Amino acid sequence: MIVLGIESTAHTFGVGVAQDQVPFILANERHTFVPQTGGMKPSEAARHHTLVAHEILRGALDRARISIRDVDGIAVALGPGMGPTLRVGAVVARALSLRFNKKLVPVNHGIGHIEIGYLTTEAKDPLILYLSGGNTIITTYYRRRFRIFGETLDIALGNMMDTFVREVGLAPPYIVDGKHKIDICAEQGSSIIDLPYTVKGEDMSFSGLLTAALRAVKKHNLHDVCLSLREIAYGMLLEATERALALTEKGEIMIVGGVAASGSLRSKLEKLSNDWGVGLKVVPTSFAGDNGAMIAYAGLLALKHGVHIDVKDSTIRPRWRIDEVDIPWRD
């Protein structure tokens, strides 16, 4: 079975191809919208996706060395994400499904991140840290659902860091030579300043930390603020993770999502894992950020278990939570 997957939930338009035998991933093509100034405007990102969609789709099929007629299903991320960009991917997927008579498979973006993590890390039953620009979630699988133990109460960890470096003039670009600008800035910091630290049970709040850090730049060295922001944010995440480990007694931690590419976070989680005597599984950098391959692979798992929908039912879901998705393939 072969499934083509389309990702367009935020700044990246990606198309991947997955099959149910080794090698599982046949193609993973994408192009990311980078605003010249300020934050990302959904309408501008959607325009970008519309312009690159044909090229990325053609590139994925060529990379996989297949024709669209060879695929068994079209998987598409219907949420969560930004409405305008989600609609671009949905329109492309619907058109392909109707034109070539292919089954349409709805995929939750977060489930895509998690399933590509399982595939690439070979994790068995992990505590999952899903960390990206739009999500900060601590979860694990239980009885056909991913159950959330902790999450951000406001903005996500990745979004908080992106916003900070943009507001202080360090970005865009946000990533240079594989390092986030917050890490590059923090390398020259030497002192930790007092900033809000908010953990409630296994939930975290980052908005107050962001506001305080932006104010602190006026009184303190920027490098020290970067260092403090990063260390306090990661400290909050680690505390919540330890509480979830104590509760679930899992034997391994799996990190997925774009923030999984952070070397500084990885080193902290390696120490935490060693202290707790559990394994640490980190999704490869090539699959950490948003990509079409993860949608294709999650769609493949779903289609093999009979999950597909009519085009008329393919409404986008900008606030679609991972704990709302039935997972028939993990039992």
Swiss-Prot record:
Fe cation binds at H109, H113, Y130, D290. SUPFAM superfamilies: Actin-like ATPase domain. This is tRNA N6-adenosine threonylcarbamoyltransferase. The keyword Transit peptide does not apply. GO terms for cellular component: cytoplasm; EKC/KEOPS complex. InterPro entries: ATPase_NBD (IPR043129), Gcp-like_dom (IPR000905), KAE1/TsaD (IPR017861), Kae1_archaea_euk (IPR034680). The gene is kae1. It is found in: Cytoplasm.
